[in-house]
Each structure stands twice: as C-alpha cells, then as structure tokens.
Amino acid sequence: MAVTLEFALPPEAAGRLARLPFVQAHRIGRARSAAAETIWSDTAEGLLCAQGLLLESPRRGKRVLRRLLPRPEAAWHPAQPPGIEAVFETDDAQPATDGAPLVALAAFTGRRQTFGLALAEGTVDAELLIGRLRSVAAESEAARLVLAGPLPAVMAAARAIAAHLPLAPPLVSLAEEARAMASGAGPRPYRLGPPDTSEASTVEDAFLRAVGHLLEVLHQQAARIRHGGEPEAVHQSRVALRRLRSVLRVFRRVVDHPDLRSLDARLREVVGSLGPARDWDVFLGGIGHHVATAFADDARIAALLRAAEARRDLAYDAAVAMVAAPGWRLLLIDALSVLLARPWRDAASGSPREALEMPARAFGRMALDRHWARLRRAGAAFETLTAEDLHELRLDGKRLRYAAEVFAPLFDGKRARRFLRRLARLQDGLGIANDVAVARGLAQALAARSAGRSWAVGVVEGWCEARVADHRGDALEAWHRLGGKDRFWTGD
C-alpha cells in the first residue's frame, strides 16, 4: 500500500533535517533544491472561501482549486494532504466566480528540497518545503515535509525523524493558514468534537472514520495545552482520549488486534497523565472559586488557594512536558500507522472478516442495546444505590454516551439529540458527587500543620457536603426522564 502523508516541522527544526543522522545514513544521493512559490487567490467578496476553497497557483505546475478543510462527512485522518476539488489544465481556465475577478490573498515563497530515503521497508520520496507565508498585513515562517512511498517505509521514516525532531501532522493546511493570515481570523482546525459517521456504510468504515476523526481532535486539543492557557485544552484532550478509547472498546468485538490493544493502553496512560491538571482546574474554577468569593477577605482561604495554584502549576509542568516530548509524537504516528495498516484484516478470517462488512447501523443497534441494558440494570434500584454504585452508574452512562455519539449520525438526528441531552443531564447530576469527592481529596492533600490551613480545608469540605445535598435530587430526576422511548436507534 503506497501512501502520501504531510507533516509539519518548526522552521528551525526543518533546517536541521538534512543533518539528522537518520537522513544522512539513508539518503539516496544528493538532495535537489529549487525555488518554490505559491499564490492563493479568491474574489474580493470571498466567494471561494465561502465554499471552503481557494485557487492555488504554484510557480511551476498546474493551478488547483484547493479545499481548505475536509467536508464534515468525509473520512479523515491526521497527516492527510488537503483535498483538491479541481485541476485547471490551461492558464485561461478559472473557477466559477460569477464573473468576479480573482485577487491574490497570500503567498508562500521559499525552497523545495527533494530527496530519497532507502529503508529496509522500501524507498521513501521526501519533499521539504521551507519558507515564509506572506499577506498584506502579516507574515510568518512555515515548513512542511511530505513523505511518499510504501506505508511501512513512510511510517518508519516519520517515526525515526519524530524521535529527534518535533515532527507531527500539521494542525492546518498551508492554504488555510494563508486564508487566516489574509483575513486576520484564526485558522480553523481540521476536526473538532465527536465524529461524523453519517456516510459510513460498514462496521469497518465507521471505525476508520471515528478513529481518524478523534486522532485529529486529540492532536488539535493537545497542541493547545500550555501554561496560562484555557483549561478547555486539557479538558477537551481528555474528552477526545475517552471518546477514542470508547471507540476502540465498542468495536472490539469485530475490529480487534494486539496493536489496537497496545494503543488503548498507551492512551489510558495519557488520560492519567493529564488527570491532575484537569482536577486542579476543576477545583480552582469550581468549589475553590465559590469558597474564595464567599470568604473574599479571609487570608486562610487565600493561602489555601495559592497552594492549590502551585499544585496546578506542577501538574501543568508535567502535562506540557508530556505533549512536547518525543513519546507523544511517536504515539500519534503509531496510532496513525495502525489505522492505515489495518492489521485486524490479516487477523480476521471467516465470520470475523465478514463482520467487518456488517452494515454500520445494524452493528450500532447491537452495541447501543448492550450499553443501554447495562445502564438500566445498574440503576434499577436508583434510590438505594450507594456512593460507589452511583460512581459505577456514572461510568456506565459515560460509556453509553460516547457510544451513542459515534452512532447517532447514522440515525434520526432529532431523536438522537434528545437522547444525548437527557443522558448528559444524568451525567451532570451524577458527576457532581464525583467532582465533590475529588475536590475533597485535593483539599485534604493541601492540609498543613497549622490551625489556619486546617480551618480552610474544613471550610472546603463543608462546602463540598452542602453542594452534594443541594443537588442530590438532580440525578434522580434525570434518571426518571431517561426512558426507553428515548432510544433513537430502535425502529427504522
């Protein structure tokens, strides 16, 4: 299987690529270098951008109508080169703009270096683009590395480079970066949120679409994790991780392989690594904030929250270091490699192989029925459940919710949205007790041998107890509202 994958490098690191021992050891002959220039154009009214397109005119070669973002329903995975809507064979051919003239929005100028790499897995053709993006109002450096060849060879090359340089799939295409620079608006990510499986026909198709989408979302969110950044980056990274792990487990009855199991274990470790940062964010933004507001002038509370902020800083040190380390880049590349290689096909034969071709809707119904039955059994005697039982019920609800998000696009949208809203309310009601339990543990971890600190911890614990009491009935009400009639996957 031959593939072409696009990666991004910081320009400074791109300048060191040729000196990398791996490249020097495997390069075929000398690298060739040539000037590179590309211009992106649109009408003054932005008619092409409104369709998610730009006209791309390279210095050499044919002009193309470049797609800025993949269509929402299209299959996608990280490092996938941006799509081409049309190729113009002659200079006078133009995209349809209702007669409006085209104007240049932004341009790339730099160098294109090409070289081959001879690996045991095969020969890889590499193309390094390094230079500057320019618009009327701004400019910035940019670099891209395109690797083409047999899949095992391309992934081996990407892995070897990423072990020593910050190579990763690009967060945006050069064309989208050019559009953002010209418009002054931020670049738009390839993918966010839950996956769109609406066009999936088979079980394997749905699996590939969901995993590819969620790998992209995870990459996008993790890239935003930084000191002083929005707490949503860590939160959404953990959500993407949980959604991705849910997909691996939900489809495991049909799509299974040791490489997928290994990937799941590595993703679980990342969830744990980001946990402390998220816990301290929730504590400081929730109960800690409410206590600080209620005791605005109390030095003991202020000291406790300063200690909490110091713990959060340490947790973010670990999170930022993790996503900047080679291990994180290699995890993304290994996950992409498994997705593209599809090793479960070789392991499947007979009925398992046929199961890969099962209609996605039929498989979705069976999977959701199993999760629904488990949730209803766990909550059958809701009023008598212990705290531990409610915690397990919350986890069952979360598993059902993530599975429902994957299959919802295959069914009636209105019914699916209602079901997910009601399930989310149940999760919120059950989650309060969990958040409070975590907050109580964090507060106790801040305890010190002083009367002031002990008093402040006691205030936080008391606040936690009061919050649980105030919301005790929310989960019960949400449970009664979530009835069997809400199951969007039943019927036609």
Question: Model regions: which residues?
Answer:
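Function-determining surface determinants
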Residues: 1-492
